[in-house]
Amino acid sequence: NYKITKKILHVHEILPNTFFLHKIINKIALKYSHALICVSKAVLQNMEEASPQYRSKLHLVHNGISFAKCIEVHNDFLKVDTHLINFGLIGRIKPIQKGQNLLLQALCLLPKDILERAHFYLVGSPVKGQEYMQDELLENIEKMGLKKYVTIIPFIKEIESVYANIDVSLVPSTLADSFPTTILESMYFKKMVIGTRIGGIPEMIIDGVTGFIVDKNSPLELSEKISYCVIHPDEVISKGIQGKIYFDKYFSIDCFNERYMACINKLL
């Protein structure tokens, strides 16, 4: 019977309550569900803000990710200069939301000698119909004199080949991201992460241990952390290793399944 069946929602996205329609959707989800399992504290807090009276329905289970398939790395997909520190920003070409613009602003603040020791790969494609965003990004790279240091690579399915060839993963989101899969992938592949203090990102990075967390409105802070990575390549490696340890302990698919089923059993 539908009426006596418990309705449990798994909430992956942050629909900002500042938008009327988003708030209505959040309120309906809270009112008509028995429970909502949220993938991050950021998601949970956003839902709570919509209807605080339903706080008891909200539960936190951090997401996990599986790499059960056989991973075959193809180095031909991305050829890098191994004498440099190679940074990768993997995600849709959405310069404001995904932080490509923030990164370019940060690069303009780097001393020339630091820039010469690094390269930055923007891996991803624009949404169909929004190709102008990539055109504008390319134009900005040219105007800022960064063409030598920044390469845009269209999205590829063999994303593991990108991780195999970069040293640092950049997640400089400027709009709330619930629990970026990119960070989980980065940790799995032993890459340290520099991410912004927004959405679920701070819940995924141990600042100073597995990577760095920077302010989403501070190109200067991002540039300082990039510079630190270039100057301290040994720490880039060690932070990546710590990230893998952290991933195995908290974000593997087995850990996720255990947490998720424990939550479900508690709710039944």
Question: Model segments located where?
Answer:
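Carbohydrate-associated surface elements
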Residues: 42, 64
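A conserved mid-protein helix/loop that constitutes part of the nucleotide-sugar donor-binding site
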Residues: 94-109, 120, 220
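Short, structured helix-loop element that forms part of the nucleotide-activated donor/catalytic region
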Residues: 119-147, 235
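Active-site donor-binding acidic/aromatic loop of nucleotide-activated sugar
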Residues: 128-134, 146-156, 162, 212-213
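Acidic donor-binding loop of glycosyltransferase active sites
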Residues: 164-178, 191-192
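Short hydrophobic beta-strand element within catalytic cores of glycosyltransferases
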Residues: 192-195, 205
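Conserved acidic donor-binding segment of nucleotide-sugar-dependent glycosyltransferases
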Residues: 207-208, 212-219, 228-234
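A short, well-ordered alpha-helix in the C-terminal region of glycosyltransferases
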Residues: 221, 228, 235-250, 256-262
